[in-house]
């Protein structure tokens, strides 16, 4: 069954809150309070330093190294170690930048975010088109959704909620509002459909692992990929815009909107979905190959 036409699901019950969840949330709130005492650039630098120091020693870094070896055959071990350190630097900076997100004004003169390609969005909006923005866990990926909200879009952001419901609510507050947050799960398709029906728009990160979905090439290996983007784009005749965030230096960024991807309409539904998601994965792969140290290599994107 087409996921976007599935029967309406009941709202999931709230996840139970454990003492571990409470401790994690308390720890996060203390860290955020301390980071708020620092200017954004200093907080970002501190987060990067601590993550570079600790991250490469964690067991999960072995997964990052395996993924890098598979994605870039022949890459030397010193180069791989350097990319792992760079990845942790970026992740540490992202974490430390959360307390300051609401103060980043993307489109103000002299902003720390350089923007390119907004004309593609303007053309879609002028034509009355609904828009799906997609990106990946690159640079500080929160910048794209932040920019969309500050641009005045009625946008629903599909995201993977943390396992800790207290952390989920805490991070939602740090994001600063301005967009509807839709956690992935049983009701995500229903809420995304509702957003598009009212004339709104959708943003999502399309690079996460699924246990189900379509096996779509990604770095020359099959990777389970959610077809929701293609289904929604086809059903609502959306303009699909790639939205890339790059970290330039420190806590400065470039947000680039690229020309829209073609939405295949051959009449062969399964083939059209596969073609659309192949184009999405190819776009993400190209960005990652250019700046591999800024991607999230510490998750099992491919089957073992």
Where are these regions (language model features)?
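Non-catalytic C-terminal accessory region of glycerolipid acyltransferases
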Residues: 2-19, 81, 85, 125, ...
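Catalytic core of membrane glycerolipid acyltransferases/transacylases, capturing the structured
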Residues: 93, 127-185, 211-216, 247
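Hydrophobic alpha-helical segments typical of transmembrane helices
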Residues: 30, 42, 64-67, 144, ...
